[in-house]
Curated annotation (Swiss-Prot):
It comes from Canis lupus familiaris. Its main location: cytoplasm. Residues 786-815 form the IQ domain. The rodlike tail sequence is highly repetitive, showing cycles of a 28-residue repeat pattern composed of 4 heptapeptides, characteristic for alpha-helical coiled coils. Limited proteolysis of myosin heavy chain produces 1 light meromyosin (LMM) and 1 heavy meromyosin (HMM). HMM can be further cleaved into 2 globular subfragments (S1) and 1 rod-shaped subfragment (S2). Residues 844-1940 form a coiled coil. This is Myosin-2. The modification Phosphotyrosine is found at Y389, Y1465, Y1493.
Length: 1940
């Protein structure tokens, strides 16, 4: 913690960044109790501060700071941190890490305007809603170069740390700024950019570019100017924020080797397009629209043809149009100048404004509906003319494209009519698309401008993205944002604990790694995995008929119940509808999927897009140049056949995922820093903080998640020296004094000696680490120890003070000795004559009076003794009474407990009875269900019986139909024979025409062979007819089997009947048992009532006892008061005696004076005086002893009195508690009595219900009996039917025998006819198949021709492709190797020990280089082998030209080539794996290789890559060389040589690449055919890629673990110079290899040209073959048409017959189903109506009960009011009594004053009495006695008044207690009323639901009726069609016969 002097460099910002020293000291010295100071959960404030009052039974009573007392559970109380942690800068350092501690720390810092706070790795910033001087230039300079712990929390500190890490660690950095809208993300992003622009300036001045004529700024200016431009087009006013960024951005600022700015680029995410066309009332659209209309630049208004009123444009005026905090005119100037600074041309600038104006005009486009049509037409063309002019389009074409877009249907384009709604939606979509594409184009243009082409080394990325969003209505945008945050949180969790683990590693702590990134894996996989939400959404977007419901159903099928993070949302009234819920790390979010498919597809009017592409405005045409329309695809399909089909259709979610993956890969390659922005309140009030809002954001931002992760490890850590200093107090003896001991050892000894959990801490190298909470425990122990030490010091202080007091006492003793000495001196003097005279005369005076006074004092003393004895006796009596009362109380408690146990037993019995009742009801239900099942079985039997009868009738019909079909078949046979003859003649003619072409002849011969096969198939069909006969026989057997089943069913029914009878008996027995139990219950109830009455009487007795006890207590209190009065009187008498003693002493003094005046006296008088003096002294001593005894007795009395009062008070309290308990028990007993009464009622009701049930059961039994009788009758009918069926079956069997005889006669003929029929059918089908096959063959031959045209090219290029694949694989190997090697360089700390073996490793490296060269040579050999194979393939192509029949053979060769390619790929993959293994094994050795050697290896491997990134990689290598700085100055010469060589290699490579590109253009056409084959290969490659990715991840982990080895590498760089010469030699070898590769490329070009010539020749041959095929196809088409005509007629007739038969059966089935459903619905409806009636009766009963309760409540309220009035009356009386007591008090004071006056007079009188005589004294004494009597009487009256006052106060207390009890009763009744009202509401709701259900059932019933009617109509129609078809078939049959 820095001092105030160190904070002075921050200037006026210092108090806003850190507490002053004074505040810190005050905070540490503030009193604090760790055990009682807590945070407590509170519903309004979320958490409040408080102190623990008590803890009991898992509940804690806490008193809050506001004074309220809360009783909560233990888990709702959180311990408070010690004061030294107040306003702590890093919240992770707190001893108690929990939500309230974090919240209050932020709140207290925010109250002090310290808006930045660390939380572990996070920097949390709270929006201050006002300007603070914390961003001044002096603050920037103050933070420059400071470590995080050296300066207070700030965004500049985060930025500077990132900058310093980048320079020192040579690693890319990123700053992730997240938070809700309005939290200050954009402001903090600006500050970060401002900081980097200030500290890393390049020093260049502004330039004027002569070429463009526009002013351009420096790179710093451009980076800063990018912000206003992006804000103008991407920011808008929202409810929370006036300047809210409606897009996310990732700004990369690139730096050079020296840390200066090199370049920058921006990536944007999730622009809110919908804001272009729609805004909420309190919001507005993007700022640019209002800047343009602000009229700051009138030329813009004229150019864009707009007005200055935004309300003229609906797209931008749906919400607000102005913002108080934004000046649109000034902002327009800033935007315009930003466009100029960023280097946009004048044309681009104009096009930006024009497109923005066109979007505004689009909102004014109006369309109307044509009369009598749904077609839309434009309503005026003025607006369209303006919009088209601004976009350089034809307005007529634009309107036509909007109203009549061209749509592709099949291979043709059709103009489609659009409705008004469709057109308006299309216009909105176009406006959004234009604006979005323009925004993205602007970002790319800014990136181009910011790319200065300067050498750049590393970058710092600033991510400004929306935080987690949980709204009432969450759509696709929220899912994307939340998914992004989920990924970022996973990234943070992983990164945070990686750093924690590194800290543990550094400190040498044993720790098993926990990857908290996996905590969120379930949710992330649910969203992005192959069958996750996004993939299902994209899949649904591919289907044309997909809807939101189908998407929802798919989600539910795939994830509901399978994934824990996917849930069905709860329906909440008043909230927006939700379709599914996801459990994110920040909470559960309900998503609404409405419109997701449209949002994801983002459809545009393709016709308008085509217009945009043809626009003369270059910018607009460029914006839509990438869009692939259907027309463009149709026109360019032949040219661009190689393009992927799905490239034009990329969904929003896929694009988002692609961008997100890019972002995550960028972030993973950086060292991240996290900033979380927080909104303190919704009202934008500075300094105010809403607890719930902030907590919600902390959860969403992952701050609390970070704390959770922190708590898993060791969040608290202290340096050993600090720990020793602070906690040495706990056990000072553990650390030996007088000798030096290391702080670590001291800490270890200290912790070992303390009684704590030793697993909760770990010892590091420099610090001791603690688990969360342990440090707080140590703090408590320290506080306790300090308390003990303080008490010891206090004891010592007290001892010292006591010694001082003792010293004083000694001094007093010495002074007493001095006094004694003086007395002794007096004793010596007393023998003087004068003194003797004095002693003699003094006792004579007033001796009589003193004797009397002594006598009176003795009497009073005796009286006090007697009274004391009496009071002690009374006290004993009271104590005995107390003992008896306690015994009685205990007896009463035991009785109450016994009664409570009895009640509990009664309740248990009641519960058992209720359970038995429920069981019986369940049994009754089972019985009824069985009965219903039996009825269903009956119904099924009857249905089966009907079905059997129907099947019998159908069998008869089938036999008749078979006979008819036999006759038809014979007729059809003759007709088909004639047709066959005609066909054979036609075939002969065709054979003559196709005689020239041998191939077609063979095909026709094959067709002839197929017809023969068809004839064979016809014979097979005849066999099937015989099988059909067998099937019929089987059906008869089945019928017999079904009859047997009927018998079995009947047996089952009989068994079920017996079961039912048994169940009935059981039910009757159970009813009897229920009645018995009911009687027992009645008896028990009577017993209970008797017990209750006994209890009532006992309670009344107890109440009477209580009253008596209260009376006794009151009497005792009165007695106590009397004793107090007596004590007071005693005190008064004592005061009197003391007064008299003082008077006597005064008189003695006067007498002595008189004696001295009088002179001498007689010796007798002196002796008398001596005697009297002795007596007087004796009396004085007695008096003093008496007074001492009196005081002692008074003190003991007071003590006893106080004790007895306290005991009596406790007894009174106990008795009051007992009374309250008894009253409560009484009320509970009353309630229990009521409950028992209600139970009795319920039992009686249950009894009634059971009786009803019995009756219903009896009715059911009777019904069952009747049903059983009916079933018996049915069984009898079935037996008769069975007999009839048996006879019929006998007849059928006889008929079958006859028919079989006929069939046996006709079977041969039938078989022959059926064979012929089937042959003809087969012939027709085969002719159709042949036609189709020929058509397909034609198409395939055409396709094959196309294939053959390009086959030679394909064969030629396959070689090149394989070669490229090999080179690619080699380059991948090289890439991996370079990656691993370059990464491995950065982690070489672990290899310090292996320095000595450097020479050996260098030799191994050389061997490795030789091995690589050998591999290159082997690859060249494979390349040659491939060339040879290509030549072979060319020979194969020549052979394929000989004949088309060899195509199959060629395909097999191609497959072989593919297999070889695969094998080669596997070989290359195996080589890759081997190289990876080698890389892993040699990795440890390669770490010590020098920079120059690595650069040369990089050169070697980059040469092999043959890609366009060679320039970039070489520049990277040169930059890596430059990293060495001054040390590696000598290597610059080598760098120049490498650059020269690089330029030569580059030139050679560019030539090779140009030739390769030329070849690739031709290969694209061949790739179309190869795609099918490649897809399989790609899949395997993808699998291998996944394996490689896995290997990547593993290696990345290895690389990360090697990061710590960098320091050793820096030390070893000096040795690199020695290897320089060797590397130069390697470079020369690489040049040779490059030349060799160039020669190979030249040879490949020559081969390619040769193959082109061969391909041209083959093309000519293919054209000739195609012409011949086309002639054949035309001839085939003629034959097919004739065959089709004949086949169509036959097929139509058959199809219609079958269809009608099927429809008839379906209709009959539907009829049966519908009737059954109708019956079911009817029964359901009746049952629902009954339940509704029951519910209505229950509701009426409850309403009556509720009215009674309300009446009772009103009565109670009236009673309460009366009690309150009584209390008021009593209060008034009390006031009166108080007034009277005050008056008496005043009187008392007056009397006391008079007494004092009288006393004064008495003194005067005594003085006079000495002179005047005894009579006057006696009179005055009498007067004094009278006055004393009056005073005593007045005192008694006063005491009585006080007693009365106390009585009234007690009465008032009783009344207040009674009022409180009444109030509680009222509240109880109110609760009861509320509960009953809730019950009523629930019953009403049930009734409503029942009504709804009945209504739905009615609607279902009506619907089914309607369906039934429709089914009947359909059946009628089907029957009529069947009849018509039968008539038609007969007519056809007659025609055929007539033709024959």
């Amino acid at each position: 913690m820095s001092s105030d002097q160190e904070m002075a460099i921050f200037g006026e910002a210092a108090p806003y960044l850190r507490k002053s020293e004074k505040e810190r000291i005050e905070a540490q010295n503030r009193p604090f109790d760790a055990k009682t100071s807590v945070f407590v959960a509170e519903p309004k404030e979320s958490f409040v501060k408080g102190t623990v009052q008590s803890r009991e039974g898992g509940k804690v009573t806490v008193k809050t700071e506001a004074g309220a007392t809360l009783t909560v559970k233990e888990d709702q109380v959180f311990p408070m941190n010690p004061p030294k942690y107040d306003k702590i800068e890093d919240m992770a350092m707190m001893t108690h890490l929990h939500e309230p501690a974090v919240l209050y720390n932020l709140k207290e810092r925010y109250a002090a305007w310290m808006i930045y706070t660390y939380s572990g790795l996070f920097c949390v910033t709270v929006n201050p809603y006002k300007w603070l001087p914390v961003y001044n230039p002096e603050v920037v300079t103050a933070y420059r170069g400071k470590k995080r712990q050296e300066a207070p929390p700030h965004i500049f500190s985060i930025s500077d740390n990132a900058y310093q890490f980048m320079l020192t660690d040579r690693e890319n950095q990123s700053i992730l700024i997240t938070g809700e809208s309005g939290a200050g993300k954009t402001v903090n992003t600006k500050r970060v950019i401002q900081y980097f622009a200030t500290i890393a300036v390049t020093g260049e001045k502004k330039k004027e570019e002569a070429t463009s004529g526009k002013m351009q700024g420096t790179l710093e200016d451009q980076i800063i100017s990018a912000n206003p431009l992006l804000e103008a087009f991407g920011n808008a006013k929202t409810v929370r924020n006036d300047n809210s960024s409606r897009f996310g951005k990732f700004i990369r600022i690139h730096f050079g080797t020296t840390g200066k700015l090199a370049s920058a680029d921006i990536e944007t995410y999730l622009l809110e397009k919908s804001r272009v066309t729609f805004q909420l009332k309190a919001e507005r659209s993007y700022h640019i629209f209002y800047q343009i209309t602000s009229n700051k630049k009138p030329e813009l208004i004229e150019m864009l043809l707009i007005t200055t009123n935004p309300y003229d444009y609906p797209f931008v005026s749906q919400g607000e149009i102005s913002v108080a905090s934004i000046d649109d005119q000034e902002e327009l100037i800033a935007t315009d100048s930003a466009i100029d600074i960023l280097g946009f041309t004048n044309e681009e600038k104009v096009s930006i404004y024009k497109l923005t104006g066109a979007v505004m005009h689009y909102g004014n486009l109006k369309f109307k509906q044509k009369q009598r049509e749904e077609q839309a037409e434009p309503d005026g063309t003025e607006v369209a003319d303006k919009a088209a002019y601004l976009q350089s389009l034809n307005s007529a074409d634009l309107l036509k494209a909007l109203c009549y877009p061209r749509v592709k249907v099949g291979n043709e384009f059709v103009t489609k009519g659009q409705t008004v709604e469709q057109v308006t939606n299309a216009v909105g979509a176009l406006a959004k698309a234009v604006y979005e594409k323009m925004f993205l184009w602007m970002v790319t243009r800014i990136n181009q401008q910011l790319d200065t082409k300067q050498p750049r080394q590393y970058f710092i990325g600033v991510l400004d993205i929306a935080g987690f969003e949980i709204f009432d209505f969450n759509s696709l945008e929220q899912l994307c944002i939340n998914f992004t945050n989920e990924k970022l949180q996973q990234f943070f969790n992983h990164h945070m604990f990686v750093l924690e683990q590194e800290e543990y590693k550094k400190e040498g702590i044993e720790w098993t790694f926990i990857d908290f990134g996996m905590d969120l894996a379930a949710c992330i996989e649910l969203i992005e995995k192959p069958m996750g939400i996004f993939s299902i959404l994209e899949e649904e977007c591919m289907f044309p008929k997909a809807t939101d419901t189908s998407f929802k159903n798919k989600l539910y099928e795939q994830h509901l119940g399978k994934s824990a993070n996917f849930q069905k949302p709860k329906v909440v009234k008043g909230k927006a509808e939700a379709h599914f819920s996801l459990i994110h790390y920040a909470g559960v979010v309900d998503y609404n999927i409405t419109g997701w498919l449209d949002k994801n597809k983002d459809p545009l009017n393709e016709t308008v897009v085509g217009l945009y592409q043809k626009s003369s405005m270059k910018t607009l045409a460029y914006l839509f140049s990438g869009a692939q329309t259907a027309e463009a695809e149709a026109s360019g399909g032949a040219k661009k056949g190689g393009k992927k089909k799905g490239s034009s259709f990329q969904t929003v979610s896929a694009l988002f995922r692609e961008n997100l993956n890019k972002l995550m890969t960028n972030l993973r390659s950086t060292h991240p820093h996290f900033v979380r922005c927080i909104i303190p309140n919704e009202t934008k009030t500075p300094g105010a903080m809403e607890h719930e809002l902030v907590l919600h954001q902390l959860r969403c931002n992952g701050v609390l998640e970070g704390i959770r992760i922190c708590r898993k490890g060791f969040p608290s850590r202290i340096l050993y020296a600090d720990f020793k200093q602070r906690y040495k107090v706990l056990n000072a003896s553990a650390i030996p004094e007088g000798q030096f001991i290391d702080s670590k050892k001291a800490s270890e000894k200290l912790l070992a000696s303390i009684d704590i959990d030793h697993t909760q801490y770990k010892f590091g190298h420099t610090k001791v680490f603690f688990k969360a909470g342990l440090l707080g425990l140590l703090e408590e122990m320290r506080d306790d120890k300090l308390a003990q030490l303080i008490t010891r010091t206090q004891a010592r202080c007290r001892g010292f003070l006591a010694r001082v007091e003792y010293q004083k006492m000694v001094e007093r003793r010495e002074s007493i000795f001095c006094i004694q000495y003086n007395i002794r001196a007096f004793m010596n003097v007393k023998h003087w004559p004068w003194m003797k005279l004095f002693f003699k005369i003094k006792p004579l005076l007033k001796s009589a009076e003193t004797e009397k006074e002594m006598a009176t004092m003795k009497e009073e003393f005796q009286k006090t003794k007697d009274e004391l004895a009496k009071s002690e006796a009374k006290r004993k009596e009271l104590e005995e009474k107390m003992v008896t009362l306690l015994k009685e109380k205990n007896d009463l408690q035991l009785q109450v407990q016994a009664e409570a146990e009895g009640l509990a037993d009664a309740e248990e019995r009641c519960d058992q009875l209720i359970k038995t009742k429920i069981q019986l009801e369940a049994k009754i239900k089972e019985v009824t269900e069985r009965a219903e099942d039996e009825e269903e079985i009956n119904a099924e039997l009857t249905a089966k019986k009907r079905k059997l009868e129907d099947e019998c009738s159908e069998l008869k019909k089938d036999i008749d139909d078979l006979e008819l079909t036999l006759a038809k078949v014979e007729k059809e046979k003759h007709a088909t024979e004639n047709k066959v003859k005609n066909l054979t003649e036609e075939m002969a003619g065709l054979d003559e025409t196709i005689a020239k072409l041998t191939k077609e002849k063979k095909a026709l011969q094959e067709a002839h062979q197929q017809t023969l096969d068809d004839l064979q198939a016809e014979e097979d069909k005849v066999n099937t007819l015989t099988k059909a006969k067998i099937k019929l026989e089987q059906q008869v057997d089945d019928l017999e089997g079904s009859l047997e089943q009927e018998k079995k069913l009947r047996m089952d029914l009989e068994r079920a009947k017996r079961k039912l009878e048994g169940d009935l008996k059981l039910a009757q027995e159970s009813i009897m048992d229920i009645e018995n139990e009911k009687q027992q219950l009645d008896e028990k109830l009577k017993k209970k009532e008797f017990e209750m009455s006994n209890l009532q009487s006992k309670i009344e007795d107890e109440q009477a006892l209580g009253i008596q006890l209260q009376k006794k207590i009151k009497e005792l209190q009165a007695r106590i008061e009397e004793l107090e009065e007596e004590i007071e009187a005693e005190r008064a008498s004592r005061a009197k005696a003391e007064k008299q003693r003082s008077d006597l002493s005064r008189e003695l003094e006067e007498i002595s004076e008189r004696l001295e005046e009088a002179g001498g006296a007689t010796s007798a008088q002196i002796e008398m005086n001596k005697k009297r003096e002795a007596e007087f002294q004796k009396m004085r001593r007695d008096l003093e002893e008496a007074t001492l005894q009196h005081e002692a007795t008074a003190a003991t009395l007071r003590k006893k009195h106080a004790d007895s009062v306290a005991e009596l008070g406790e007894q009174i309290d106990n008795l009051q508690r007992v009374k309250q308990k008894l009253e409560k028990e009484k009320s509970e007993m009353k309630m229990e009595i009521d409950d028992l009464a209600s139970n009795v009622e319920t039992v009686s009701k249950a009894k009634g219900n059971l009786e009803k049930m019995c009756r219903t059961l009896e009715d059911q039994v009777s019904e069952l009996k009747s049903k059983e009788e009916e079933q018996q009758r049915l069984i009898n009918d079935l037996t008769t039917q069975r007999g009839r069926l048996q006879t019929e079956s006998g007849e059928f069997s006889r008929q079958l025998d006859e028919k079989e005889a006929l069939v046996s006669q006709l079977s041969r003929g039938k078989l022959a006819f059926t064979q012929q029929i089937e042959e003809l059918k087969r012939q027709l089908e085969e002719e159709i198949k042949a036609k189709n096959a020929l058509a397909h063959a034609l198409q395939s031959s055409r396709h094959d021709c196309d294939l053959l045209r390009e086959q030679y090219e394909e064969e030629q290029e396959s070689k090149a492709e394989l070669q490229r694949a090999l080179s690619k694989a080699n380059s991948e190997v090289a890439q991996w190797r370079t990656k691993y090697e370059t990464d491995a360089i950065q982690r070489t700390e672990e290899l310090e020990e292996a320095k000595k073996k450097l020479a050996q490793r260098l030799q191994a490296a050389e061997e490795h280089v030789e091995a690589v060269n050998a591999k290159c040579a082997s690859l060249e050999k494979t390349k040659q082998r491939l060339q040879n194979e290509v030549e072979d393939l060319m020979l194969d192509v020549e052979r394929t030209n000989a004949a088309c029949a060899a195509l199959d053979k060629k395909q097999r060769n191609f497959d072989k080539i593919l297999a070889e390619w695969k094998q080669k790929y596997e070989e290359t993959h195996a080589e890759l794996e081997a190289s990876q293994k080698e890389a892993r094994s040699l990795g440890t050795e390669l770490f010590k290789m020098k920079n120059a050697y690595e650069e040369s290896l990089d050169q070697l491997e980059t040469l092999k890559r043959e890609n366009k990134n060679l320039q970039q990689e070489i520049s990277d290598l040169t930059e890596q060389i430059a990293e060495g700085g001054k040390r590696i100055h000598e290597l610059e010469k080598i760098k120049k040589q490498v650059e020269q060589e690089k330029s030569e290699i580059q030139a050679a490579l560019e030539e090779a690449e140009a030739s390769l590109e030329h070849e690739e253009g031709k290969i694209l056409r061949i790739q179309l055919e190869l795609n099918q084959v490649k897809s399989e290969i790609d899949r395997k490659i993808a699998e291998k890629d996944e394996e490689i990715d896995q290997l990547k991840r593993n290696h990345i982990r290895v690389v990360e673990s090697m990061q710590t080895m960098l320091d050793a590498e820096i030390r070893s760089r000096n040795d690199a110079i020695r290897l320089k010469k060797k590397m130069e030699g390697d470079l020369n070898e690489m040049e040779i290899q490059l030349n060799h590769a160039n020669r190979m490329a030249a040879e490949a070009l020559r081969n390619y040209r040769n193959t082109q010539g061969i391909l041209k020749d083959t093309q000519i041959h293919l054209d000739d073959a195609l012409r011949g095929q086309e002639d054949l196809k035309e001839q085939l088409a003629m034959v097919e048409r004739r065959a089709n005509l004949l086949q169509a007629e036959i097929e139509e007739l058959r199809a219609t017959l079958e269809q009608t038969e099927r429809s008839r059966k379906i209709a009959e089935q539907e009829l049966l189903d519908a009737s059954e459903r109708v019956q079911l619905l009817h029964t359901q409806n009746t049952s629902l109506i009954n339940t509704k009636k029951k519910l209505e009766t229950d509701i009426s009963q409850i309403q009556g009960e509720m009215e009674d309760i309300i009446q009772e409540a009103r009565n109670a309220e009236e009673k309460a009011k009366k009690a309150i009035t009584d209390a008021a009356m009593m209060a008034e009386e009390l006031k009166k009594e108080q007034d009277t007591s005050a008056h008496l008090e005043r009187m008392k004071k007056n009397m006391e004053q008079t007494v004092k006056d009288l006393q004064h007079r008495l003194d005067e009188a005594e003085q006079l009495a000495l002179k005047g005589g005894k009579k006057q004294i006696q009179k005055l004494e009498a007067r004094v006695r009278e006055l004393e009597g009056e005073v005593e009487s007045e005192q008694k009256r006063n005491a009585e008044a006080v007693k009365g006052l106390r009585k009234h106060e007690r009465r008032v207390k009783e009344l207040t207690y009674q009022t409180e009890e009444d109030r509680k009763n009222i509240l109880r009744l109110q609760d009861l009323v509320d509960k009953l009202q809730a019950k009523v509401k629930s019953y009403k709701r049930q009734a409503e639901e029942a009504e709804e259900q009945s209504n739905t059932n009615l609607s279902k019933f009506r619907k089914l009726q309607h369906e039934l009617e429709e089914a009947e109509e359909r059946a009628d129609i089907a029957e009529s069609q069947v009849n018509k078809l039968r008539v038609k078939s007969r007519e056809v049959h007659t025609k055929v016969i007539s033709e024959e």
